UniProtKB/Swiss-Prot annotation:
<protein>
    <recommendedName>
        <fullName>Uncharacterized protein MT1403</fullName>
    </recommendedName>
</protein>
<comment type="similarity">
    <text>To class-3 of adenylyl cyclases.</text>
</comment>
<dbReference type="InterPro" id="IPR029787">
    <property type="entry name" value="Nucleotide_cyclase"/>
</dbReference>
Length: 250
C-alpha cells in the first residue's frame, strides 16, 4: 500500500520537469553553462515522510501543494530545480549565487506547505555539470549530508556558504555558528573540519535539538547525542535593499 502510493507521489515531487519549463538560471545572471563551475546547492527533505504519507488523501494533496509551490519559489530566487536528484521525499535546487539559495530556503520555510515540514542543507563549491539540470560530485554529496543533519524546519549550511553570504543575508536574518565537528555524522562522511551554521529569522523556529550526528569518545566508540551546541549568535542585517525581503546578488 505504501509503495503503491509512494511512486506516483514522488513522481509529482521529483518529476516536475514534465510540467514545468526549465529555468535558464545562468542566462538570467549573464553566465553560460560549463562542464564544471562554482555553484550553491540546496538539498531539501520532508521531515517524517513515512508518517506523512501514511494517509493517502493527505499524501497526495501534500505532494501536489509541494510540487507547485516549491518550483515557483525556486524560480523566484533565480534557481533551478534539478532533474531526478532528490533523494526519497525531497528535491535539489541549484543557484549561481549563495545569497539566492539562502533567501530561497527562508521562503520555503515560511511557505504554507502544511502538513509538510522541510529540513534543508546548503553547500557552495565546485560541481560537475553532467547535463543542463544534473550535477554530480562532492558538492552534491556535502549538501545532502547537511540536509541529513538538519531537523524539520531547520536550514544548515557549510562554512563555504556562510562565508559567501556574510553581509548578503535576507532582511532580519542572522546565522548561529556551530562548533567544528569532532566526528562524522551518523552513517555519513561529512568532513570533520567543516564549519556549520544555522539560518535564523524572527518568523522561523530557531531552537532545535542537537544535529543528527555521532562522535567518538576517548575509547574511539561512536555514540549518538554528544554533539554541537550553539556557541555564537551573529546577526547580519541586510543593508541597502529597496524593500524588506530582498537580497543583494552575491
Amino acid at each position: 500500500m505504501f509503495m503503491a502510493l509512494r511512486a506516483p507521489m514522488l513522481e509529482r515531487m521529483n518529476g516536475l520537469h514534465t510540467d514545468d519549463a526549465p529555468v535558464n538560471w545562468l542566462e538570467r545572471r549573464g553566465g553560460r553553462l560549463t562542464s564544471r563551475r562554482r555553484v550553491t546547492l540546496l538539498h531539501a527533505g520532508v521531515e517524517h515522510p513515512m508518517r506523512l504519507w501514511g494517509v493517502q488523501s493527505e499524501a497526495i494533496t501534500a505532494a501536489m501543494v509541494l510540487s507547485r509551490k516549491v518550483s515557483a519559489i525556486i524560480a523566484g530566487h533565480c534557481g533551478v530545480r534539478l532533474v531526478d536528484q532528490g533523494v526519497g521525499d525531497g528535491f535539489v535546487a541549484a543557484f549561481a549565487h549563495a545569497s539566492d539559495a539562502v533567501a530561497c530556503a527562508l521562503e520555503l520555510h515560511q511557505a504554507p506547505l502544511s502538513p509538510i515540514v522541510l529540513r534543508i542543507g546548503i553547500h557552495t563549491g565546485e560541481a560537475q555539470l553532467v547535463d543542463e539540470r544534473i550535477y554530480a560530485g562532492a558538492t552534491m554529496n556535502l549538501a545532502a549530508e547537511l540536509r541529513d543533519l538538519a531537523h524539520g524546519g531547520q536550514t544548515v549550511m557549510s562554512g563555504a556558504t556562510e562565508d559567501a553570504v556574510l553581509g548578503r543575508l535576507p532582511m532580519r536574518a542572522w546565522l548561529i555558528g556551530l562548533r567544528p565537528m569532532e566526528g562524522s555524522p551518523e552513517g555519513h562522511n561529512f568532513p570533520q573540519s567543516q564549519r556549520i551554521a544555522q539560518l535564523c529569522h524572527p518568523n522561523l523556529r530557531n531552537t532545535f535539538p542537537p544535529l543528527r550526528m555521532r562522535i567518538a569518545d576517548a575509547s574511539g566508540i561512536p555514540y549518538v547525542g554528544r554533539i554541537l551546541v550553539n556557541v555564537q549568535v551573529v546577526p547580519h542585517w541586510e543593508g541597502g535593499c529597496a524593500a524588506a525581503g530582498m537580497v543583494l546578488a552575491g
